[in-house]
């Protein structure tokens, strides 16, 4: 008997150790859910289409909010980390205690007493004793609802479930408000005493999209009796229901319901996430692990895999909810490439399928409709990033099992760069393209002229990269030259805040503008001085109508990722550039909460000071990121803020659209990554202190603190050396290769 007890104890201990080794347990869905992060805290599969969770009011983009404590119900579709107008929040269900005296809807809105969050799981207990647990598959929500034992069915009261197909986020009594969703139609049909099906059709939302339809099929393990049009009563205290969703039909929604129970699906969602997250193994504090693995998790929630669920065409793969590429191309897409190269290849092919069917690739897309473009046509950066890293090319396409037709991709990129979308410029393409091609910049007065000019130049550089690799020398030379157009808005003699040279507004006649109109009043025409920290619009005009989008000239003037050597020269050389960077950070011009400044801390690399990059990054993370619910400094934007954090915790950061990573001292003392080709990459911090000295790869010092993606994919060890005292100078200046174009031979595979 004692031996049997010992055996059981050892078995339980081993199971406990295995459980502790699972990294999914470090994911905290609450991180970023409060404050400005706006992350979705409910259950989701990687890139999952179904994201069920509570809608506390119709205002939060992710549905959930810490306050007020009421819950309107649980809807099946949400986005994560987004700003602007709401999207989705379709097919709401709400467990209620129905009574003949009070009526059905009197207790529709419930008050939360407590909540439980973990990866793949959400639960809450209402004030009336109802407890709801939720998990999800890719296209189906699972609910386990516990009613109080004292509330069994009587002729006058019952345990009930309300289904509201008219619900959506962003409801507003005023019709046709910009960025607001509007109801189009809905239907609820009772098939039998275990099955309900129907649809919800809504239009608008953040991207001002066409109407989309969410079909559903609800299956219950207990028979119900219908009470009214959309309320169903049960003579039981435990109810298991599944809500399959589809964008094609109710029949497809039913087929999307897995044949398993709640606990089985909960284990499956966690196993699926574990397969993705455990590719990284890290050593560090518990806080480090929570922050890092949650950042990876946020990066893999969107875009959404809707392959086979597009009502407009059948080509696969198909991904939706690019929300938005302007946010995600800098760090989210490169991180997905490292974690799941096959997935990134599918995402690129999805962009090309959208181009094939709709004429343009999106810069943003939701509800099966392109829109809204924010700055450039940044699908070009995503494609170039995949191209220079060999994704879907040659032997690498065989390794990941997906091939990308880059000749066709170049065609799609050139469509963006050469064909003005006209009135559809907020949906896709390049607004102001004719002016850009005529003047070499976009004149003031056209929305987001400064942002568009800078980003179009960057996009042109990405076109040049792909064209060179494909042997299209004529296209390469033209777009390489065009990538210098940022210089046409560089006002070299403008001095402000002890710094000379800024990206500044210019009119169609080529005149620099020292003052600009304030607002768009047709009666008054006030002018205000324009400076590098001026937001050229009053409160009632959004970022869409300003010279720069979501940042100011002081920030955008350092955002030339494809030509940092040219930027340094324009600023007056390396020493002047360093002083400018120092003042930029010390005077609080840097804004980690918006994407245009993502690369800025790494600009010290180009003047041979990766140690200063390391210092800035460490301070930025310390000041702005935590493992708390308000632990993100800005809208997570489909994993943008989170992927920025994850990369820097590892000690590397991509320059999107280019083939290398910039290296600095990691925050994690040791990590390993299982690469998609089977090789293993290891990072280890050596020495004591915080001052970055040097980095080696497989024992060889990397003089410029940078590593090529192709070298990284061979696997090996990155050793980051730190010390307590700073050296006079760390590393060396970046080599001045030709415009940073990768040295690909004609049609040469990387």
Language-model features: locations:
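Bacterial N-terminal signal peptides that target proteins for export
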Residues: 1-10
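ATP-dependent phospho-/nucleotidyl transfer catalytic cores
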Residues: 459
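Accessory carbohydrate-recognition regions in carbohydrate-active enzymes
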Residues: 22-149, 158-333, 337-381, 387-392, ...
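N-terminal signal peptide c-region/cleavage motif recognized by signal peptidases
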Residues: 15-18
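Surface-exposed interfaces of beta-sheet-rich extracellular modules
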Residues: 686-699
């Amino acid at each position: 008997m004692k031996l049997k007890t010992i055996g059981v104890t050892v078995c339980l201990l081993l199971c406990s150790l295995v459980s502790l080794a699972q990294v999914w347990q470090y994911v905290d869905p609450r991180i970023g859910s409060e404050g400005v992060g706006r992350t979705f805290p409910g259950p989701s599969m990687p890139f999952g289409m179904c994201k069920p969770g509570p809608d506390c009011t119709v205002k939060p983009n992710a549905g959930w909010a810490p306050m007020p404590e009421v819950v309107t119900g649980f809807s099946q579709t949400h986005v994560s980390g987004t700003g602007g107008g709401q999207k989705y929040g379709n097919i709401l269900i709400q467990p209620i205690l129905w009574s003949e005296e009070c009526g059905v809807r009197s207790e529709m809105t419930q008050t939360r007493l407590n909540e439980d969050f973990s990866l793949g799981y959400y639960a809450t207990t209402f004030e009336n004793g109802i407890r709801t647990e939720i998990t999800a598959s890719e296209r189906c929500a699972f609910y386990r609802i516990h009613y109080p034992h004292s509330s069994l069915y009587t002729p006058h009261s019952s345990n009930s479930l309300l289904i509201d197909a008219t619900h959506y986020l962003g409801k507003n009594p005023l019709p046709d408000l910009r960025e607001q969703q509007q109801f189009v139609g809905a239907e609820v049909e009772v098939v039998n005493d275990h099955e309900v099906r129907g649809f919800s059709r809504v239009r608008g939302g953040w991207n001002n999209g066409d109407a989309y339809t969410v079909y559903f099929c609800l299956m219950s393990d207990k028979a119900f009796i219908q009470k009214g049009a959309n309320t169903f009563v049960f003579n039981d205290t435990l109810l298991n229901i599944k809500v399959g969703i589809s964008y094609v039909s109710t029949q497809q929604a039913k087929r999307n319901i897995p044949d398993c129970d709640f606990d089985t699906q909960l284990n499956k969602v966690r196993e699926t996430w574990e397969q993705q997250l455990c590719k990284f193994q890290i050593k560090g504090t518990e806080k480090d692990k929570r922050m890092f693995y949650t950042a990876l998790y946020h990066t893999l929630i969107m875009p959404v895999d809707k392959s086979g669920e597009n009502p407009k065409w059948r080509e696969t793969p198909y991904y939706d909810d690019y929300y938005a590429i302007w946010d995600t191309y800098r760090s989210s897409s490169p991180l997905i490439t490292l974690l799941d190269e096959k997935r990134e290849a599918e995402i690129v092919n999805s962009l090309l399928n959208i181009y094939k069917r709709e004429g343009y690739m999106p810069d943003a897309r939701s509800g099966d409709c392109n829109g809204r473009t924010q700055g450039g046509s940044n699908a070009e950066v995503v494609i170039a990033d995949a191209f220079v890293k060999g994704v879907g090319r040659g032997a690498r396409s065989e390794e990941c099992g997906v091939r990308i037709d880059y000749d066709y991709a170049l065609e799609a990129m050139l469509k963006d760069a050469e064909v003005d979308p006209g009135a559809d410029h907020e949906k896709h393409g390049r607004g102001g393209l004719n002016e850009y091609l005529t003047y070499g910049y976009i004149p003031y007065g056209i929305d987001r002229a400064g942002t568009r000019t800078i980003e179009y130049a960057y996009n042109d550089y990405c076109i040049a990269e792909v064209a060179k690799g494909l042997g299209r020398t004529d296209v390469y030379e033209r777009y390489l030259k065009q990538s210098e157009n940022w210089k046409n808005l560089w006002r070299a003699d403008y001095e402000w805040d002890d710094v000379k040279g800024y990206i500044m507004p210019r009119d169609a006649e080529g005149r620099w503008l020292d003052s600009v109109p304030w607002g768009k009043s047709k009666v008054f025409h006030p002018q205000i001085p324009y400076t590098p920290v001026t937001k050229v619009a009053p409160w009632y005009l959004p970022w869409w109508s300003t010279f720069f989008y979501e940042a100011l000239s002081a920030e955008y003037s350092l955002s030339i990722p494809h030509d940092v050597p040219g930027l340094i020269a324009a600023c007056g050389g390396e020493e002047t550039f360093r002083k400018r960077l120092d003042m930029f950070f010390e005077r609080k011009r840097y804004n980690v909460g918006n994407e245009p400044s993502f690369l800025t801390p790494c600009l010290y690399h180009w003047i041979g000071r990766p140690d200063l990059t390391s210092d800035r990054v460490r301070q930025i993370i310390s000041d702005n990121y935590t493992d708390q619910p308000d632990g993100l400094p800005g809208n997570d934007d489909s994993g943008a803020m989170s992927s920025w954090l994850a990369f820097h915790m590892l000690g590397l950061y991509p320059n999107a659209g280019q083939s290398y990573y910039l290296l600095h001292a990691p925050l994690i003392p040791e990590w390993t990554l299982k690469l998609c080709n089977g090789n293993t990459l290891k990072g280890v911090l050596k020495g004591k202190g915080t001052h970055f000295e040097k980095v080696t790869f497989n024992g060889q010092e990397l003089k410029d603190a940078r590593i090529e993606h192709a070298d990284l994919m061979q696997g090996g060890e990155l050793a980051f050396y730190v010390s307590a005292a700073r050296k006079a100078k760390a590393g060396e200046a970046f080599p001045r290769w030709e415009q940073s174009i990768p040295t690909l031979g004609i049609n040469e595979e990387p």
